[in-house]
Amino acid sequence: MAAAFDKISVVRVNEIGNRDVTILEHDSIRVMVDDIGGMIPELSSVQDTRRLNAHWLPWFRSNTMKPFNDAEYGSFWKANLLYNIAGNFPCIPNFGPGHIFEGVDMPPHGWTANLTWRFVNSGIDEETKAAWALSVMESPDKTMPLSFKKIDVIIPGHSVHYTSLSVNNQGDTDIDICAGWHNTVGAPFLQPGCRISGSANTWTTPPVGGEFDTTTRLALGAQFDSLDKAPLARGGKIDISQVPGPIGYTDFAAGAVPVSASLGWSALINPVLKMAYVCFFTGPAAAREDDIILRFNDLWMQYGGRPFTPWAPYEGGTDLTYCLGTENSIAAYAYGLEYSRRVKQVLGAPATITIPARSGKTLRYGTLFSPYDTGLDEGVLSVEAEAAALVCSGAKGNGSFKADPSFAMLKGISGRHG
């Protein structure tokens, strides 16, 4: 289905790799949403006569034109997720590695990142003139009877991709889950000198026993108060708020969103291109009973520390992958649902959220990608919500961006079309 109004449109196409996708576009941004895993390989901004894509497109992303088959492709790609991975994607009910939990086969980062979303409909909302696309998914295992409904939205004048993702529990028992958005940026937007920040004011690296044991330069299981004072494994400290080049390490850090925050956020600034990438979501202080509230800023700093496939072209080869995950989640690090249920909390914040029996909750999320003036060159220090704007404060000035930080418009569009 295709729909358009003035200079805003939503169309269905088949992209490279034989993937069915929805493209939402207006004057300032274009968003491509894959059916498979809800991957978002493109969030691009108009730059004069060209476009700049913020999102990561891995060199190893499959273009075989065939679905993943473990017998044929497993030795290189290791998992269906890595066969199709790109950009940003929703991670529910798992955030972390694949595992069997209470008899349920839980794929890496959950069903929402692996299975095919069923496209339902799309169009232009008459009231707001926003473009929207609705997709749904059902749990493949009746032991965990969840259903998912996702509506992707772009609003005229906003350089923001909005998503409302509802999780419904169709069973008679409450279910504790993890949830997250795996925002991943890549070159050419990502480059040395970019500045990372988030709403968290307390950070930690994951404990020993996970995937970063052999890849990280950071001290594991260490807590710190500022990204510019992250502890190194060899001793000393390093500023991880400044993005390096491919240095041969893959690191992870998690920061707790303050319970007093009405708005949660994470940001990446490119001071050379003068582009801001800002994720925002309802904070703990503004939570309602039916909200899925993300509790952590998670940084996956993939700077070349994985000498194995598919990150490297062969086992023991050079990791060719350079990207940054500015992820936001409710989960214990990226260690998975079973681990998150077991530890219950990280930095005093809950690692899971309960979906009540015969009920549901909704995660509302925005990703902004926009030019800015010089005031944000040294990074974003804080983000505040105004009635119709997102205000980012930097060391040398502010940047105000048209947005719907209360998600009032998103809620209205979801109610009319979801």
Features from the language model and the residues they span:
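Surface-exposed acidic/polar loop and edge beta-strand patches at domain peripheries
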Residues: 2-162, 173-176, 180-418
